[in-house]
Amino acid sequence: MKKILVTGGTGFIGSHTVVSLLKSGHQVVILDNLCNSSINILPRLKTITGQEIPFYQGDIRDREILRRIFAENRIDSVIHFAGLKAVGESVAEPMKYYDNNVSGSLVLAEEMARAGVFSIVFSSSATVYGDPGKVPYTEDMPPGDTTSPYGASKSMVERILTDIQKADPRWSMILLRYFNPIGAHESGLIGEQPNGIPNNLLPYICQVAAGKLPQLAVFGDDYPTPDGTGMRDYIHVMDLAEGHVAAMQAKSNVAGTHLLNLGSGRASSVLEIIRAFEAASGLTIPYEVKPRRAGDLACFYADPSYTKAQIGWQTQRDLTQMMEDSWRWVSNNPNGYDD
C-alpha cells in the first residue's frame, strides 16, 4: 500500500483514478484548484469508495501548499493530472497554458525533490506525436510538431522530466501518453462535466442528448476513412484509470523514464460513435457536417503491445460499455455535479 498525491484529482480522469487507487488498496490525497472541476464530486467519491479522502484546494504553482502537503503526509508517489486541456483555448491563450502546464509541473517536481519524493506518473497525451504519417503510434516514434500550445506543453513537460531523471537517477518518471478517454464510472455518480461548449466528441453528444445543444457538429466527412469521418482510439476512463494504477505499481520503484501508450489499439469513426450512443440511449442525435478543422488528423490509434508487456495492462471495456456508462451519467446528472 502506498500513499499517492493526485494533482487534479477532482477532474474527469483524476477522479476516476482516485476510485481505482482506493479500490487497489492505496491511500490518496487530492490537490486541485477546482478551475475545471467541482467540489461536489467529493461526497460522490466517498459514496463510491466508502472513504473520506483528504483534499487540499490549491494550485501546483503554489510552493507553500505543496510543502504543507508533503509535510503533513508521507507521500510515496505523485500522479500528476493538474493542468489546462482545451486545445482551442491554448491557441488563444498560450501564456496561460505554458504557465499552468509547464511552469506548474516544474514547481511540482522541485518540491517533490525537496520532500524526497522521486516517483511521478505524468498525464501526457498522444498529441505529442504530432502527425507521424503512419499508424498505429508506437512509443519509439519521436515527438512530432504539435499543432497547439496544449500539445506543446505536454511535450515540454515530458522533456523536462526526462532531463531531470538523466541528471538525478533516483527518479522514476512514468510518462503516460493517452488517446481519447470517454465513458464514466459504472455507478453513474461521476463522469465528465466540461465547462461551456465541449471540445471533445462524446461530451458534445451528451449535451445534445440532454437537450442543452441543438445538434452535433461533425467536422469533415471527406477523410480517407471507411465512412469519411475522422477515426480515433477511444478508451474507457476506468480502463485509463486502471492503467495509471498498473503503471504506478509496476514502475514507481524502478528508476528511469518509462514511456507508455494507454490506448485500445482500435479506431472508431465519428459516425460509429454517434450510432453506438444512439443504440445505448435510444435517442437520435441530430448532426450537421461542417468543414474539417485545421490540424485534425484522419485517423490515429495506439499500438498497446509494449504497455501490455511492461505493466500487464490492456483495455477491458468495449465501445458499448463506454456508451452505456456515458448515457447513465448524463441521464442521471443532466446538470453534472450541480444536480
Curated annotation (Swiss-Prot):
Substrate binds at residues 125, 150, 180, 200-201, 217-219, 232, 293-296. Its EC number is 5.1.3.2. Its cofactor is NAD(+). It is an enzyme of class 5 (isomerase). GO terms for biological process: galactose metabolic process; monosaccharide metabolic process. GO terms for molecular function: UDP-glucose 4-epimerase activity. Pathway: Carbohydrate metabolism; galactose metabolism. The active site is at 150 (proton acceptor). Coiled coil: none annotated. It comes from the Bacteria. It holds the Pfam family Epimerase. Homodimer. Involved in the metabolism of galactose. Plays an essential role in the incorporation of galactose into meningococcal lipopolysaccharide surface molecules, which are important for pathogenesis. Catalyzes the conversion of UDP-galactose (UDP-Gal) to UDP-glucose (UDP-Glc) through a mechanism involving the transient reduction of NAD. This is UDP-glucose 4-epimerase. The lineage of its organism: Bacteria, Pseudomonadati, Pseudomonadota, Betaproteobacteria, Neisseriales.
